Every structure is written in C-alpha cells, then in structure tokens.
Design a protein with these regions (language model features):
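A penicillin-recognizing enzyme superfamily signal
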Residues: 17-26, 30-211
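Mid-domain, small-residue-enriched loop/turn segments at the edges of structured enzyme/sensor domains
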Residues: 1-26
C-alpha cells in the first residue's frame, strides 16, 4: 500500500485509484445480468464501405458472482428505491435498483473556501433496470469558493429523468428470480438465523431470500 498521499476511508474497500461513471455502470450491470460482467464498450460493429464487410465487436463476458448473489443484491437495492426513496422517488413502470453515495470535503478545504460543514464534494447515483445500467456523478472537480452542494435533490431528479427517458417500456421491466434462491420466513433478530416457532409473534417474523 502506497500511503505517501495519506490513507482514506475508501481504501478499506479497495478504492485506491478512484472510479468513474462508466466503470461504475459496468460494475452495477453485473448485478442485473445475473452475475455476468461485460466491460463497457462504445463501438458494437464496424461496416466497411468499400467491401460491405461487417465486423461485430463484443467484449468478453465473465461470471463474477453467482446468480443468487446478484439477485439478492438487486432485491436490496430495489427495496432501497421503493421503500426508502434513496433517489428521491421511483420511475413509473420501471423496476429500478439503485444506490447513492457522497464524499465530504476535508476540514482544511472547508476552511480555505469558506464552505459550511454540510458542503458535499461528490454526489453519486448508480443503478440498473432489467434493460440498462446508469451511473451519474455530480459535483466539482476542484473547490470553488461560493459554489458547493449540500444535498442530492438536483442529482436525484436528474438521475430519475435520465432513466425515465431512455427506458423502453415495451421491453421486460422486471427482474427474474433465479431458481438458486428461495423465500423463507425467519425470526427477526436471531443469529444464526432461526425459523420461527409456534409461539413466535407475527411482528417478529420476516420473509427474506436465501440461497437454496
């Protein structure tokens, strides 16, 4: 580990070199693709005018996780959007699984630029539907006195509008549940997880996905 520039909280998750929206969209797409990752690409085919020959270009697809793991992550992120409104709302007619994130300015940057403690450096939203994967970054490359973010309203509204505009409602808009998982009713607050007994009250039962 090269700590010459100092260690940061994100290093605990392996984020040494940062990321960008294209990489993030590609990573999240693997959850929606049942655990298969395809490196994002811009050109899908080349047509030669002189010969009429067509060359199809596709990146290699690699399984990076089981379909069970991929769907259980999807289920969590669907719940985050639909129940907690982590992107400020849902997109009508679209099953959207998404996660938001922010990074804060260091104290010295807040002082140097006169920013309030609530100022946010980067705002991210990454998510996917059964059809598309979209990642959005909103922020400033360098601090500018007088300009800063303190909330995600603009970013979340923009993200929902993008997903809404490019989603094709004529295509399938729900995720398939793989046969490798089952729904099981268990007792809350038990570890290891236990099945409910005959005397377990209903408010202490919860139904979740588990690997079959």
């Amino acid at each position: 580990i090269d700590s010459e520039g100092g260690l940061h909280e994100a290093h605990a998750l392996g984020a040494f070199n940062g990321t960008n929206p294209v990489q993030l969209a590609g990573a999240y797409a693997a959850f929606g693709n049942g655990g298969y990752f395809t490196k994002p690409y811009s050109v899908s085919k080349i047509e030669y005018i002189d010969s009429g020959k067509t060359v199809n270009l596709k990146n290699k697809t690699t399984r990076v996780m089981s379909d069970a793991t991929a769907y259980m992550i999807t289920d969590v992120l669907l719940y985050a959007v639909e129940s907690y409104g982590n992107i400020g709302g849902t997109v009508p007619g679209v099953s959207l699984a998404a996660k938001t994130g922010t990074t804060n300015y260091p104290d010295e940057v807040l002082r140097e630029n006169g920013f309030p403690s609530s100022a946010i450096n980067d705002l991210w939203t990454a998510g996917y539907t059964p059809e598309i994967s979209v990642a959005l970054w909103y922020g400033y490359d360098t601090p500018v006195p007088g300009y800063y973010n303190t909330g995600g309203y603009i970013k979340n509204n923009l993200y929902r509008r993008i997903v809404d505009a490019i989603s094709d409602r004529n295509k399938k808009q729900s995720f398939d549940v793989p046969s490798s998982i089952v729904r099981v009713t268990v007792e809350k607050e038990t570890y290891p997880v236990q099945l409910p007994g005959e005397n377990t009250p209903d408010d202490m039962k919860v139904t979740e996905y588990c690997k079959a």
